[in-house]
Amino acid sequence: MPVQSRWVCSACGQTAAAVGPGGGSTPPRCRNPWCSSADRPLAAIFAVGTYEGAFRRAIVSYKYRRDLRWAPVFGRLLHGFLERHETWFEEFAVICPVPSFIGQGARRPWGHTELVCAEVGRLAGAEWPVESLVTKVAETEPMSAKARPARRAIARTGLAKAFTVPQPAAAEGRHILIVDDVCASGWTLLTVSRALRDAGAEEVAALVLARGVLGANRPSGSP
C-alpha cells in the first residue's frame, strides 16, 4: 500500500503530501509556483502561525477595524519567534517593515505593520534594529479575494511601481528581514524583496504573523 508522508517546503513553509512506496525519498515540488522560480528574490518566508480561526479574527480586527490593542501583542509574538529561532536569523542585520501608503487616497491612513515593528524594535534593541528602508508611494488595489490571474496583473502593474527604496546605499550588501502581517499570495513580499535586491541587498527573507493556507476557501470579499 502506498504510504503518505508530509514534506515542508523550506522556502514558504507550506506542507505537501508525497505518495509512494514507503513515502518516497524525493520531496514533491511545492504547490506554490514561486518556490521553484529561478529568479525568486525572496530567500524564505517564516510565519508565526496560519491565517485562520482566532488568529485571523485578531489580525482582521487590528488591520481593518483599527483595534490598536493588538499592536503590542503582535510585536511580542514576532519578537518571541525571533528569539526562539535565533539561529535562523543570525545573519540578518536589520528588520524592515512592509510599508503602508498613508498619503491622499490611502485605504488606511496609518501604518499597521510599522506600528507592530516599532514594538519589535523596542524589545529587540540593537540585536534586530528596525529601519524603514522601503517606501510605498501610491495606493494599490487590494488583492484579497482576487483570483490568481487578477493578482498577477495587479502585481505587475500598480504593485511593482508602488514600492521604492529611497536610499539604496542603506540596503546595499545587507541581509534584510522584511516583516508583514499576512502572506496570502506572496506578491507583496516578492515585490518589496525585489525592490531591496535591486537596490543592492545581499539577501532578503520575510517574517509574517500568519500565512494563508494554499487552497483555503474564504468568502468573496473577505480580508
Describe the predicted segments one by one.
Residues 1-223:
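Glycine-rich phosphate/pyrophosphate-handling loop used in enzymes and phosphotransfer proteins
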